[in-house]
């Protein structure tokens, strides 16, 4: 009876707390003249297909989030406190609750500017964004109404690129461009294209070439609905002046060095197999990323840092610094159990690992487990289980040359063996 009484008392307490939470105002702690921002809404006039989520993140001030059916218990809890923040009880209640978001008109104006800028970035020029403020008691609901601006289709695309080998390589890459005549013009599209193109040029040997060398001109005077596009590649970045201009040139790899902790015993041949960067090769950003991925995949190093240092002579040196991780360790686990028949069980487990057992990134895993069950009042009822497992993993495909595996992933050959002994009242068996 006592257990039932405690249960009903607990349920009554929870029900009372929930009722108080629902009934408590969410604006009780607001000062005179303050309002709680209850909601934001975005609507696009005349275009139901536009995804409003594209601009919702650009609203500066967000209302309190709701957890259950438009209810936030932590917001209600915060409003249980009094207005005097110096009282200990009020400070405690506020520390576990959530303060109401106080509506700020200046944030609405800033949000309108933010949304307008982002719409222009998406290619909607001359958009109109307005706000409608609805006040209900001490709460404010803000609606942002958007009339989308004009969009232009891309007409002819022309290029202005420095002459020489760079121009040949650049124009050869335009077959893979993501900006084509007939597409909608937007800064978003052009930005993505410059990132793609800059990456492609770095793969062709142009170390240090970035999207900041690009600029664009759009001509909308000759047609009301289309824009002629001029893509320019300069020899100085957007933040520089012409006197800083330098010809774009291909780089060759110079010295390639690999360093790691001196106390780590390791076969350098394994590292050379993992590294796809070689002195005299043309610089290729893909190979840098591949080397980083392959060295990280060894799981021997907590840090892999690839540093590229250009020289004035068109050569870039590569310094690879490896920070070792913990090479070996133990994991111990012990579990206990009982069941309805009165059996008591103890299950110990021990695992040992070594990441560099033969000094070539070979992983060794050893596991030992047991499961012992018995009855406390009847020692004749018992069962025992013991198991051991061993695994060895090599960072190569045994029997095949490493030269045929050139991608970022590292092939592995795994050898596993296990033994399990079970002694139960019904049977005794060994499993390998």
Language-model features: locations:
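Bacterial N-terminal signal peptides that target proteins for export
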Residues: 2-11
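C-terminal motif of bacterial Sec signal peptides marking the signal peptidase cleavage site
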Residues: 21-23
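Periplasmic polypeptide-binding modules associated with outer-membrane biogenesis and secretion
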Residues: 3, 25-338, 369, 374
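N-terminal alpha-helical segment
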Residues: 10-13, 267
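Gram-negative/organellar outer-membrane beta-barrel architecture
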Residues: 169, 284-432
